[in-house]
């Protein structure tokens, strides 16, 4: 499945309330099957995943290196459409972006999920 990759920010939506948490170093993917975008973390070291971006001497954002191995699964996690690439609900795990409050939650939230 072809994916387009963008580096961006996101908010967590829990119980229809935006917590306004910014995800640094995460990836925004666009599903080639249904065209919906969703946020997804890369399989990177723990400290890298939760590291804030660094600003270069030119004032540009520098993000961590993302390395995708053969075990990294590209799946559509958008709840806004029915897509053949969506995983079963029980496989979806949400990670909060704080090292102090890393929580696994087995329920789908609005567009923010990891496997």
Swiss-Prot record:
What keywords is this UniProt entry annotated with? Membrane, Transmembrane, Transmembrane helix
- Where is the chain membrane-spanning? 10-30
Q: Which residues form a coiled coil?
A: none
Give the superkingdom in one word. Answer: Eukaryota
Subcellular location field: Membrane
Indicate how the chain sits in the lipid bilayer: Single-pass membrane protein
Keyword Transmembrane helix assigned to the entry: answer is: yes
Q: GO cellular-component terms in the record?
A: membrane; peroxisome
> Which family does the UniProt entry place this protein in?
Belongs to the UPF0377 family.
What is the protein name for this chain?
Putative UPF0377 protein YHL045W
What organism is the protein native to?
A: Saccharomyces cerevisiae (strain ATCC 204508 / S288c)
């Amino acid at each position: 499945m072809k994916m387009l990759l963008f580096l961006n920010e996101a908010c967590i939506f829990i119980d229809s309330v935006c917590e306004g948490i910014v995800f640094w170093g995460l990836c925004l993917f666009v599903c080639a099957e249904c065209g919906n975008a969703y946020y997804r973390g890369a399989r990177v070291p723990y400290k890298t995943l939760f590291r804030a971006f660094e600003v270069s001497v030119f004032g540009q954002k520098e993000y961590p290196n993302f390395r995708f191995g053969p075990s990294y699964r590209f799946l559509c996690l958008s709840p806004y459409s029915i897509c053949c690439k969506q995983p079963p609900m029980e496989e979806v795990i949400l990670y909060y972006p704080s090292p102090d409050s890393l929580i696994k939650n087995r329920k789908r939230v609005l567009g923010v999920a990891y496997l």
